[in-house]
Amino acid sequence: ESMFTQVRSANRRVSPVEDNKHKVVIKAVYVVLEPQYQNSLTEAAKSINEMNGPVGIDLSGYLIEELRNDKNYEDFKADIASADIFVASLIFIEDLAQKVVEAVSPYKENLKASIIFPSMPEVMRLNKLGSFSMAQLGQSKSIIGDLIKKKKESDGASFQDSMLKLLNTLPSILKYLPVEKAQDARTFILSFQYWLGGTTENLKNFLLMISEKYVITENLKDQLEEFKIQDPETFPDLGIWHPMAPNMFESLKEYQNWENNRNDIKPKDNKTPTIGLVLQRSHIV
């Protein structure tokens, strides 16, 4: 049994409140490796529902290890069967990747959108955004192969760097695609930028963008203007973060300038320790 399998996804499902003003409720299902994305997605869906606008979100999600539990896996399959949007990220555990593929493949055509961020090739093939799929990108196979290779390396190579490499490579491929496919590919790139940002606000705008482009009908799209979908907020790949600072710092000099000019604290006592933590980027943003 996995350490995660005592948690039922049904206990954290996000649904619109009763007597809401939503004209359409969109069902989204996700599978992720990192729990911080689970938290951000939950808050993003709640934020959309609390606006009580034309669109509501019914969100259910799983950490990938939770799918080892038979009941969770059956719940996942039932959720997928009625989903509008499916999202997955960092699915690199082979047996669990196969479970995801087996659950989602029969319903891929029914999904309005399926967005798969770097995962094993068979999972990446579940991507579906309009006319775009990863299979259409001639270089996608080698890029994904590189991602898997780096994931397995023991020299400390950053898997995050590999994700960013994929993001940076895709624009150069777009010029070889027909216009319609290029537009959908750009949506995938934009989705990736929202995802790498990882904040509640970024993921809220990600869900709204996908809903607007692929789920809701034309007569409702004008009403989405009240949501004011924002561009992705980006963060540096490497940096220094302080909980009291207004932003992340990209250099030690920037951080020291801010620290030395703070007026919200007393001059430092020489005996006061400074504590630094080394964290993955996704744990901060």
Locations of regions flagged by a protein language model:
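An N-terminal assembly and electron-transfer interface module characteristic of large anaerobic redox
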Residues: 1-285
